[in-house]
Structures are given as C-alpha cells and as structure tokens.
Amino acid sequence: MARVKKKVLLIEPNYANKFPPIGLMKIATYYRNRGELYGDGWEVVFYKGDLKRFVIERITDKLIEKLNDADGTNRDWHFHKDILFEYVRTRRTELLDSLPVTIPAVSDGEKPVKNIALLDLVNEAKDKYWKKTWEQEPEWDRVGVTTLFTFYWDITIETIEFAKRLVKDPKDLMVGGVLASIQPRELSEVTGLHIHKKGQAGGIHIGILRAGDLDKGDEQKIDELELD
C-alpha cells in the first residue's frame, strides 16, 4: 500500500511586493526532495493572497471530487467550479439554478426533480465554510509563513494567526524570514509561538535554515538548494 503523502502549505502574506519568496521556494525543494532521499514524500502547496479564499478553494475542490464520484453521469463538475465557489462563498441560493442538479423526467407528464444527493453535497460544503467546521479538520501537517519588513507587521500577524487554524498541530507552524529574524522575541510575545529549536520544524526561525533545522538527521543544506 502506497504511503499517504503528508502536506505542507507555504504562505507568503499578501504583501504588496513583486519579488519571489526565495526562502519558501527552497523549502519547497527541501520537502520534494525528502521523498527520494528519505521515503516520506510531501505534497507541497504555495499560496499568496486572501486566506479565506484559499479555504473556500480547498473546500470547493473537495466538493468537486465528491460530486464527480456521486454523479451517475459522465459529467465533469470541474466545469462548474466558479459557480460552486461562489455558492460556498456567498450562500446565494439562485446560483443553484445554474447547476446541473436536476434529474430529467423519464416519461411524458412527469416533472424533472432535483437530485437531492448532489444538492446535499453542495450544501454540506457551504455549511463547512460558514459554520467553520473546516477548523475542526485541519488539512496541513505543516504550515510555513515567510515574513518581510517590520512595516508589514499587521498583515504578518494576521497571516500567522490565520495559519494557526490551518495546521493540524500549532507546534508545526513555521515562521521565518526578515521580520522573524529581526524581531523574534516580539513576534513570539504577540503570537505565542516559541523560538525554533533545531530538529523541530515549528517555531520562529532566526536567520538562514541549515541542515537538520526542520527534521533531525536531514542533511540537506536548505539555503543552498535550488529554487522550486
């Protein structure tokens, strides 16, 4: 049986900058390499933007998988992703009229009926977002947040606090970068995160990442890795 991949989410706060997050790109390479080097491959996802939209996107993607499995036709629900996303985001019931959830009449005189099973899946996804039950089922084994300059303090803190809701265990939330290296103790006081200890991925990382910083015994020199 194939081993289930762990998942790591790498986040750049929605900074107004155009430079690529080099640190996160090297960390992405690190995690992708672990599959070949140590046999524990990771699924790596990078995100920059509105994290609420990210949550809705993930809920919608899982909804599409369920709809494709439950629908008895050859329909591909990916073609309806935009409408599904908007319904989960807004709860506007008129959007349901644009979805193919009607079972055609099989004989003259019969009226088409709604496919309740499909509608239930759609509404479960909507409720998962609005009732915040997604917070009870975090998807990510590790989450990393990069930081820039101190004048981005507010958005950095907001991102870290949101990231706590995405990771399965808060001790596996990694924060690094410029601000984390300049003001680690101030960041620790505000967020409650500990200063990083070698061999434990989570915490506030100061300076560059070295071999063994994220996983004990891993000999990859992270700062020297190629960009993903």
Regions found by a protein language model. Give the residues of each.
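N-terminal [4Fe-4S]-dependent radical SAM core
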Residues: 2-8, 189-228
